[in-house]
């Protein structure tokens, strides 16, 4: 299927979305962590912790963190879940280079590694991972169905998928407040701190366009996942999706 956010690109209507997303994240990588925590008022840390807590009972030993960015989720997951191996994948080397430095400082280089991967065409073997996580990156996929299908392929039978994604609140007054915040505050702060005039206009557009709630639950189910559930966090600003292969 085609989804509205797949047509939204950071810089130009011409060219591949994945290449423009890679360029965008390479550009904003140095300022990304500061911006992320500032724009979410630090609440993003609690969202990550909720996602990781859901995985704890399953004790996954081989984990892939898709769209790993600067490695925040990977580092927290490694501390909390104590896996044998965690591979962070992303299309942006700029983001992963920041992540590599953070992992080194945490003393986790033997457990966490990074690999440049396009999630619509992963290089890993079938049934490779016990768990796959995606935090705030799935709406940037050039092809959502392909990305989910590839994650399904490399996940072991009985393995678990966890997705965190920013969503649009659907109730008054948070819906109205979030609209103002995403249209004015996010682009203004983004331009100021990242020096990229397009990135933080693109991101709110993709949040609004991305399928959410029951619609996203059905998208995940269609590629083969079972026991698909979702939970809205912080008045619907973020949604946690969980599924099993």
Curated annotation (Swiss-Prot):
The protein's matches in PROSITE patterns, at most eight in alphabetical order, are given as: SAM_MT_UBIE (PS51608), UBIE_1 (PS01183)
Instruction: Read off the Pfam families from this record.
Output: Ubie_methyltran
Which positions are annotated as binding S-adenosyl-L-methionine? 70, 90, 118-119
| UniProt keyword Hydrolase, yes or no | no
What EC number(s) would the UniProt record show?
A: 2.1.1.163
SUPFAM superfamilies assigned: S-adenosyl-L-methionine-dependent methyltransferases (SSF53335)
Reaction catalysed by this chain?
a 2-demethylmenaquinol + S-adenosyl-L-methionine = a menaquinol + S-adenosyl-L-homocysteine + H(+)
User: What keywords appear on the UniProt entry?
Assistant: Menaquinone biosynthesis, Methyltransferase, S-adenosyl-L-methionine, Transferase
Question: Is RNA-binding tagged as a keyword?
Answer: no
Q: In which pathway does it act?
A: Quinol/quinone metabolism; menaquinone biosynthesis; menaquinol from 1,4-dihydroxy-2-naphthoate: step 2/2
Q: What GO biological process, any one, is recorded here?
A: menaquinone biosynthetic process
So which domain of life are we looking at?
Bacteria
Gene Ontology MF terms: demethylmenaquinone methyltransferase activity
Q: What is its biological role?
A: Methyltransferase required for the conversion of demethylmenaquinol (DMKH2) to menaquinol (MKH2).
PANTHER family tied to this protein? 2-METHOXY-6-POLYPRENYL-1,4-BENZOQUINOL METHYLASE, MITOCHONDRIAL, METHYLTRANSFERASE
Q: Which family does it belong to?
A: Belongs to the class I-like SAM-binding methyltransferase superfamily. MenG/UbiE family.
Classification via HAMAP family:
MenG_UbiE_methyltr
What is the protein name stated in its UniProt record? Answer: Demethylmenaquinone methyltransferase
Naturally occurring in which organism (per UniProt): Bacteroides fragilis (strain ATCC 25285 / DSM 2151 / CCUG 4856 / JCM 11019 / LMG 10263 / NCTC 9343 / Onslow / VPI 2553 / EN-2)
């Amino acid at each position: 299927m085609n989804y509205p956010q797949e047509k939204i690109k950071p810089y130009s209507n011409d060219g591949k979305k994945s290449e423009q997303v890679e360029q965008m994240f390479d550009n904003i990588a140095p300022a990304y962590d500061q911006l992320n925590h500032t724009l979410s008022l630090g609440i993003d840390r609690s969202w990550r912790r909720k996602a990781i807590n859901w995985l704890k009972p399953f004790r996954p030993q081989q984990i892939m963190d898709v769209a790993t960015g600067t490695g925040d989720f990977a580092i927290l997951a490694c501390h909390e879940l104590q896996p044998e191996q965690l591979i962070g994948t992303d299309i942006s080397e700029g983001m992963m280079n920041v992540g590599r430095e953070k992992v080194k400082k945490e003393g986790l280089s033997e457990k966490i590694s990074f690999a440049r991967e396009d999630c619509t065409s992963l290089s890993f073997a079938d049934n490779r991972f016990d768990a796959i996580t995606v935090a705030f990156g799935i709406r940037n996929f050039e092809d959502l169905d392909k990305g989910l299908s590839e994650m399904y392929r490399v996940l072991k039978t009985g393995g678990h998928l966890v997705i965190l994604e920013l969503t649009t609140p659907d109730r008054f007054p948070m819906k109205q407040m979030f609209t103002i915040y995403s249209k004015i505050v996010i682009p203004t702060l983004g331009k100021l701190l990242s020096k990229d005039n397009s990135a933080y206009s693109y991101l709110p557009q993709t949040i609004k366009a991305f399928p959410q709630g029951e619609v996203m639950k059905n998208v995940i189910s269609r590629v083969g996942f079972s026991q698909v559930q979702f939970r809205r966090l912080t008045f619907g600003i973020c949604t946690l999706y969980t599924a099993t292969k």
